[in-house]
């Protein structure tokens, strides 16, 4: 593959840039950090795009040494380099209230993301699992019922993989055309505003920057990355990522522990 004239490099974090080290949390390799910093140094804008909260992504960005725009909450929020809000979509309060009630009645662990704060009940083992993966600050509540009536940026149910699949099949017809339901990890079912999509957020950002698809390279490993790698002129999938994503990708590279993305950047973007 010839060297790509990339003006905007967009990448997912977990499983794409970050290695999940279980008890030790997630990290990026020095080689990949160096490659991302070299991209910015040559004038390529580096945008981090994740399902995580904006504040959590900025912490990771500082560790990586990059400071471009941020797509957070799986595309529900877009902020520019100076953290100015460019777009923010929220979930209908009625839908959010129904999901909160369902989770409380069934004893399901639910994350409620609202106004930059993550609220959750301390239900094990899901509390420790989520904190171990993301290190996000959480405000614990005895019940999420008081949150009914608010418009969260997104909701995340974490439970057994089989239950995640069953819930998706149960709730998708109910909220068709009104909310997006997406499995972002085997144990995660996210309920998001219908407008929330990394691809839509990337298209919005590209328009604001007067960039065309061929100016953009995007990388990811999950179903929530399909939109953005499909929009980008060059879409990169991680080898151990979701099959549906790999089918849409132009290039497949090794996982972060094998330095696949770092090697691609070194050989094709620098």
Which residues does each predicted region cover?
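Short active-site oxyanion
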Residues: 43-47, 67-68, 154, 214-216, ...
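Short, structured coil segments at secondary-structure junctions
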Residues: 64-66, 73-74, 175-177, 231-232, ...
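Asp-based, Mg2+/Mn2+-dependent phosphohydrolase catalytic module
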Residues: 231, 236-270
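Conserved acidic, metal-coordinating active-site core of Asp-based
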Residues: 102, 106-109, 113-219, 223-231, ...
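Asp-based phosphoryl-transfer active-site loop
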Residues: 5-22
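Active-site phosphate-binding/coordination module
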Residues: 29-127
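Short, acidic loop-to-helix structural element flanking the phosphoryl-transfer center
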Residues: 25-44, 88-96, 137-140, 195-207, ...
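Residue-level signal for inorganic ion chemistry
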Residues: 14, 39, 74, 155, ...
């Amino acid at each position: 593959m010839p060297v790509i004239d990339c003006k905007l490099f967009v990448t997912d974090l977990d499983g794409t840039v970050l290695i999940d080290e279980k008890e030790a949390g997630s990290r990026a390799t020095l080689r990949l950090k160096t490659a991302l910093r070299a991209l910015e140094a040559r004038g390529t804008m580096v945008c981090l795009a994740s399902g995580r909260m904006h504040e959590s992504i900025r912490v990771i960005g500082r560790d990586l040494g990059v400071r471009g725009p941020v797509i957070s909450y799986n595309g529900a929020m877009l902020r520019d380099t100076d953290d100015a809000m460019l777009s923010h979509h929220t979930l209908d309060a009625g839908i959010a209230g129904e999901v909160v009630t369902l989770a409380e009645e069934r004893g399901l662990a639910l994350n409620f993301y609202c106004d930059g704060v993550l609220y959750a009940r301390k239900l094990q083992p899901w509390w420790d699992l989520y904190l171990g993966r993301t290190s996000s600050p959480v405000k614990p509540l005895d019940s999420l019922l008081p949150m009914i009536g608010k418009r969260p940026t997104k909701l995340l149910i974490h439970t057994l993989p089989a239950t995640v699949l069953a819930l998706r099949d149960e709730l998708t017809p109910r909220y068709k055309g009104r909310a997006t339901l997406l499995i972002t990890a085997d144990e995660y079912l996210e309920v998001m505003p219908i407008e929330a999509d990394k691809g839509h957020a990337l298209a919005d950002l590209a328009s604001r920057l007067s960039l065309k698809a061929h100016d953009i390279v995007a990388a990811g490993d999950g179903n929530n990355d399909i939109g953005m790698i499909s929009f980008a002129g060059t879409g990169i999938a991680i080898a151990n990522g979701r099959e549906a994503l790999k089918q849409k990708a132009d290039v497949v590279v090794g996982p972060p522990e094998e330095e696949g993305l770092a090697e691609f950047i070194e050989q094709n973007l620098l």
